[in-house]
């Protein structure tokens, strides 16, 4: 009987531990994305790597809205960079800088 109670207490303790690590992992993912953006310095290759973290965040219900909004911003920025390579460099660069600043300000 004592063993059964001890096992039940240990099992409930493990469940509590397992539940408390999930929010920590979620916040770590968001922190990882922010760190990725802050170190990307506008590099298209690095931003593409950040996109993979966003894809994981999209799967988490509590971060889905944030991830969707950031995905749009990142795609806008990537399209902006492509436009600078193919055409009106100076006019588009100002727009790119604006989009990049939005991304950075959301990840401080």
Swiss-Prot record:
A lipid is attached at residue 17 (N-palmitoyl cysteine). Its main location: membrane. It comes from the Bacteria. Induction: In the absence of chitobiose, expression of chiPQ is silenced by the MicM small regulatory RNA (sRNA), which sequesters the ribosome binding site of the chiPQ mRNA by an antisense mechanism. In the presence of chitosugars, the chbBCARFG chitobiose operon is induced and acts as an RNA trap to degrade the constitutively expressed MicM, leading to the translation of chiPQ. The keyword Membrane applies. Keywords: Cell membrane, Lipoprotein, Membrane, Palmitate, Signal. A lipid is attached at residue 17 (S-diacylglycerol cysteine). Residues 1-16 form the signal peptide. GO terms for cellular component: plasma membrane. It comes from Escherichia coli (strain K12). It is found in: Cell membrane. Pfam families: YbfN. InterPro entries: YbfN-like (IPR025727). This is Uncharacterized lipoprotein ChiQ. It is a lipid-anchor.
């Amino acid at each position: 009987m004592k063993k059964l109670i001890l096992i039940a207490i240990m099992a409930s303790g493990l469940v509590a531990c397992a539940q408390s690590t999930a929010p920590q992992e979620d916040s770590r993912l968001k922190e990882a994305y922010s760190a990725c953006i802050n170190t990307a310095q506008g590099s298209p290759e690095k931003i593409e790597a950040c996109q993979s973290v966003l894809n994981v965040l999209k799967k988490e219900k509590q971060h889905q809205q944030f991830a969707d909004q950031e995905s749009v911003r990142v795609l806008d920025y990537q399209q902006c960079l492509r436009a600078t390579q193919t055409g009106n460099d100076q006019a588009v660069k100002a727009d790119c800088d604006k989009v990049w600043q939005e991304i950075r300000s959301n990840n401080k």
